[in-house]
Amino acid sequence: MPQACVIGLGRSGIAAARVLHRDGWQVTVFDQADNDQLRHMGQPLVQEGISLKLGDRLDPVKEAWPERIVVSPGVPWDIPLLVAAREKGVEVTGELELAWQYLHAVPWVGITGTNGKTTTTSLVQAIFQKAGLNAPACGNIGYAACELVLQNQNYDWIVAEISSYQIESSPTLAPQIGLWTTFTPDHLSRHKTLENYFNIKASLLSRSAIQVLNGDDPHLHSHGPNLYPQAHWTSTQGANHLAGLCDPKQGVYLQDNWVNAFGELIAPINLFKMPGQHNQQNLLMAIAAARLAGIDKKAITETLLTFTGVPHRLEPICTINGVQFINDSKATNYDAAEVGLSSMKGPTILIAGGEAKEGDDQAWLAQIRQKAVAVLLIGDAAPNFATRLKAVGYENYEIVETMANAVQRGLELASKNNASAVLLSPACASFDQYNSFEERGEDFRACCLGLV
């Protein structure tokens, strides 16, 4: 029986292990962590005949190399173990690549980008489902891709949100339609340079049969046309903004408050409920994918009327004494947080901080000076953020450390300063205090609802 190892016991790792085991592999799952939660998650695998090694790692000195290694998205692609495995001829892939090997006969929409991926993916899936298609979302959202393999349904399309980590470990994944939402510095601690990060993202679009790019993104606008001369482009700034990118009849754009897709009027933009120009950009990309997949205007318009957003992305939680509390926990870098704050209509109390990332904070700081009447700082980044705010002449900040303190103080300051909203938009990863941005957002939700 051939040997396979899965590294990482998350949702992706569990699904990958089951796919391999189903197809006759002798599977061992490794995870360096060992706790009650992981043991509980792994127990069904053990009962199914899959080996589980917690608090341990694959050691080829103690045991022979397996024929195959599948890694979860959180495992760096260049760790010495995986480099050595590839040199030994071991097949090393990510979980998404494993799923692609089973599901490549189904057309995929692959969505990548620094920011905007999840909302765009959710919009694409919503439109496709409104059109009556069996089009599940997977990857960085929804199902682990290998869960779709196990369900073994007759899929019309697969809609995949694909991170740079997943692209890196999926060398043959080739969507029918590839969408690139935005590009700004992120994940540099993993990818080392901006060029590496860009090239990883670009490789997915290069393998896609049809490319769609956001023409409002400066980096894509500058570098995309040479890479993808046949690409379709989108813009919230009118047909003229597509000049030099594509024929407007081959793009999707806003003109006079109407969505125009491939030369056809689709719907007035005021039907769309989500705030912010960035969400309009996400919508245009989703409409481009839908029209390229042959979906009619009716399904698109009906989705515009009913789609209200996704959790942790400018998600309204509640209103207390006229102050709206908004969860933008997904804003894990400066650019996403700057976009979130810019979408606020009135004076805002901002909650920021967490595990800081590399990046240019200038536009974010400028937006704070323009929109935030006070900033409440949490997590490990709080002292550094305080220093940065002070350096640009912004003094109305407080280090409050925890989410509960921030929410309580936010309500007090909002009342005192006539602010219309308290916005959690951290500009940071969450791993100093939480396991994920979702967990951070749920803590914010619980703290807010505790004040109602």
Swiss-Prot record:
<dbReference type="Pfam" id="PF08245">
    <property type="entry name" value="Mur_ligase_M"/>
</dbReference>
<feature type="binding site">
    <location>
        <begin position="113"/>
        <end position="119"/>
    </location>
    <ligand>
        <name>ATP</name>
    </ligand>
</feature>
<keyword id="KW-0132">Cell division</keyword>
<dbReference type="InterPro" id="IPR013221">
    <property type="entry name" value="Mur_ligase_cen"/>
</dbReference>
<keyword id="KW-0963">Cytoplasm</keyword>
<comment type="function">
    <text>Cell wall formation. Catalyzes the addition of glutamate to the nucleotide precursor UDP-N-acetylmuramoyl-L-alanine (UMA).</text>
</comment>
<dbReference type="InterPro" id="IPR004101">
    <property type="entry name" value="Mur_ligase_C"/>
</dbReference>
<dbReference type="GO" id="GO:0051301">
    <property type="term" value="P:cell division"/>
</dbReference>
<keyword id="KW-0133">Cell shape</keyword>
<dbReference type="GO" id="GO:0071555">
    <property type="term" value="P:cell wall organization"/>
</dbReference>
<dbReference type="GO" id="GO:0008764">
    <property type="term" value="F:UDP-N-acetylmuramoylalanine-D-glutamate ligase activity"/>
</dbReference>
<comment type="similarity">
    <text>Belongs to the MurCDEF family.</text>
</comment>
<keyword id="KW-0547">Nucleotide-binding</keyword>
<dbReference type="GO" id="GO:0005524">
    <property type="term" value="F:ATP binding"/>
</dbReference>
<dbReference type="GO" id="GO:0005737">
    <property type="term" value="C:cytoplasm"/>
</dbReference>
<dbReference type="GO" id="GO:0009252">
    <property type="term" value="P:peptidoglycan biosynthetic process"/>
</dbReference>
<dbReference type="Pfam" id="PF02875">
    <property type="entry name" value="Mur_ligase_C"/>
</dbReference>
<dbReference type="InterPro" id="IPR036615">
    <property type="entry name" value="Mur_ligase_C_dom_sf"/>
</dbReference>
<keyword id="KW-0131">Cell cycle</keyword>
<dbReference type="GO" id="GO:0008360">
    <property type="term" value="P:regulation of cell shape"/>
</dbReference>
<keyword id="KW-0436">Ligase</keyword>
<keyword id="KW-0067">ATP-binding</keyword>
<protein>
    <recommendedName>
        <fullName>UDP-N-acetylmuramoylalanine--D-glutamate ligase</fullName>
        <ecNumber>6.3.2.9</ecNumber>
    </recommendedName>
</protein>
<dbReference type="InterPro" id="IPR005762">
    <property type="entry name" value="MurD"/>
</dbReference>
<dbReference type="InterPro" id="IPR036565">
    <property type="entry name" value="Mur-like_cat_sf"/>
</dbReference>
<comment type="pathway">
    <text>Cell wall biogenesis; peptidoglycan biosynthesis.</text>
</comment>
<dbReference type="Pfam" id="PF21799">
    <property type="entry name" value="MurD-like_N"/>
</dbReference>
<keyword id="KW-0961">Cell wall biogenesis/degradation</keyword>
<keyword id="KW-0573">Peptidoglycan synthesis</keyword>
